[in-house]
Amino acid sequence: MGDVEKGKKVFVQKCSQCHTVEKAGKHKTGPNLSGLFGRKTGQAPGFSYTDANKSKGIVWNQETLFVYLENPKKYIPGTKMIFAGIKKEGERKDLIAYLKKSTSE
């Protein structure tokens, strides 16, 4: 498991332009991530997803996020997420630790 505080920095630098994590937070270019863990792809209420995201059918957890965050367009071809991914394993682990904590509060 990664470091939550380091993960928060990764989120602010690489994710917060398009995503929020607060419960009942607003969608931006990307969906609000509250309740992310245990939810299927393409299921955040009120966000308009691509068919690729809606039909992927995987459940978000530490393992699926770890693979997805390395290369989102490879994991879900057709996603509208324009982020290239995080190649460093440590950064991904830190980000996932932060997301696990912040999206369940």
Swiss-Prot record:
GO terms of molecular function: electron transfer activity; heme binding; metal ion binding
Keywords: Acetylation, Electron transport, Heme, Iron, Metal-binding, Mitochondrion, Respiratory chain, Transport
Transmembrane segments: none
A Gene Ontology cellular-component term: mitochondrial intermembrane space
Record's subcellular location: Mitochondrion intermembrane space
Annotated heme c binding sites: 15, 18-19, 81
Residues carrying N-acetylglycine: 2
Major subcellular location class: mitochondrion
PTM comment, free text: Binds 1 heme c group covalently per subunit.
Similarity comment: family membership: Belongs to the cytochrome c family.
Protein name in the entry: Cytochrome c
Provenance organism: Entosphenus tridentatus
Gene: cyc
